[in-house]
Amino acid sequence: MEYFNVGKIVNTQGLQGEMRVLSVSDFTEERFQKGARLALFDDKDRFVQEVEIASHRKHKQFDIIKFKGMYHINAIEQFKGYNLKIAKEHQGKLAEGEFYYHQIIGLEVYEKDQLVGEIKEILQPGANDVWVVKRQSKRDLLLPYIPSVVLCVDIEKHRVDVEIMEGLDDED
């Protein structure tokens, strides 16, 4: 079975079995809603068990979650550093022009048919995602995911076409 990362448990929260999660999903409300089923993977990326979300709330930059049947700190403390993943068949369909992070990370970025680099990470600083592009012999390039910059995403061809606006590339 194929799984995709949706968050990392970074700490416990209080004594009632809540955990702080750093999400790596655009769909946190859906992923962490009550009744959602996720898989726990340890720090060596080995499957541990499937869990069901009992509760979810936001606190600062964290998603605070609780697993069904685990209502005390002693039951969940061992999960610090573990990853939460969703099974591929539970991901759901996206609208046209929407993508999962795992589909974007690793794509090659081109400007006017010149290879710029490869997308290595996606940041969520505010209104728009920012794609971090690893380049040869240059610093990483930060590209906002907006229509005037990202012109075309072709998952099949493993390619993204962009127009790097003036001011985005401080090495030119």
Swiss-Prot record:
GO biological process: ribosomal small subunit biogenesis; rRNA processing
Listed GO CC annotations: cytoplasm; ribosome
Domain PRC barrel: 95-168
Cited InterPro entries: PRC-brl_dom, PRC_barrel-like_sf, RimM, RimM_N, RimM_N_sf, Transl_B-barrel_sf
Cell location: Cytoplasm
Entry's Gene Ontology molecular function annotations: ribosome binding
Keywords: Chaperone, Cytoplasm, Ribosome biogenesis, rRNA processing
Similarity comment: Belongs to the RimM family.
Domain notes: The PRC barrel domain binds ribosomal protein uS19.
Quaternary structure and partners: Binds ribosomal protein uS19.
Protein purpose: An accessory protein needed during the final step in the assembly of 30S ribosomal subunit, possibly for assembly of the head region. Essential for efficient processing of 16S rRNA. May be needed both before and after RbfA during the maturation of 16S rRNA. It has affinity for free ribosomal 30S subunits but not for 70S ribosomes.
Protein name: Ribosome maturation factor RimM
Source taxonomy: Bacteria, Bacillati, Bacillota, Bacilli, Lactobacillales
Gene behind the chain: rimM
